[in-house]
């Protein structure tokens, strides 16, 4: 009897939680090694992970990221297929199309049109679509990729809301920690719909917290667009009448980049009333 030689045409490597016992830099190195290995002929690598490092470093090939989610004893699978990825890009561009239509509308006032032109710039349609395709690879960095593992993501307009709410959850609102919330700064209201579209495909529940910016026609357009963009994974939306500083009853700093520091300074120095903090917590509880 002659033993047959085993010479498979392909090799499947299964790796459970490769991040175990590795600090982030080592995880980065291992991820690069696994990607290089999977690029070889006849090699396929499948990993299971709870590490944002492995998620963020594979966003450019987001179709290779599969999210498993258990609900009421049933495990569901979510994946952004290539078709879904293209649909996300097209849906993201709907806001540009909406603004462009307002430019052609004779009932849109000059001030609003000037603001829209400033937002749109002179980017050509083809290039704009290409830019949409790479936005997530730029934005879903190591920190933001943590949103993939949250029970619910609180999408905030800017860094001020994120910094303050994160601080309160870590230090004051102990009961909210158990809700496994991730507070996401999307770097401006004009990006909120992009994350809503992505989270829909990945089955990630989310709520939105933003400024209404009253008496601003362009913001009225985007506010309504966000409302209309709700999907089955969008829980709730709340708009402050103006800015969070107005809600908290504190002044705005002279520089925009000082806003997160400004809010935290006023809070730590007892300049924000307990009633305001209570009302803010009630808003967050309704959102999640």
Enumerate the predicted regions with their spans.
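Switch/communication elements of ASCE P-loop NTPase nucleotide-binding domains
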Residues: 1-136, 142, 220
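Acidic, Mg2+-coordinating catalytic modules of nucleic-acid enzymes
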Residues: 95-155, 159-288
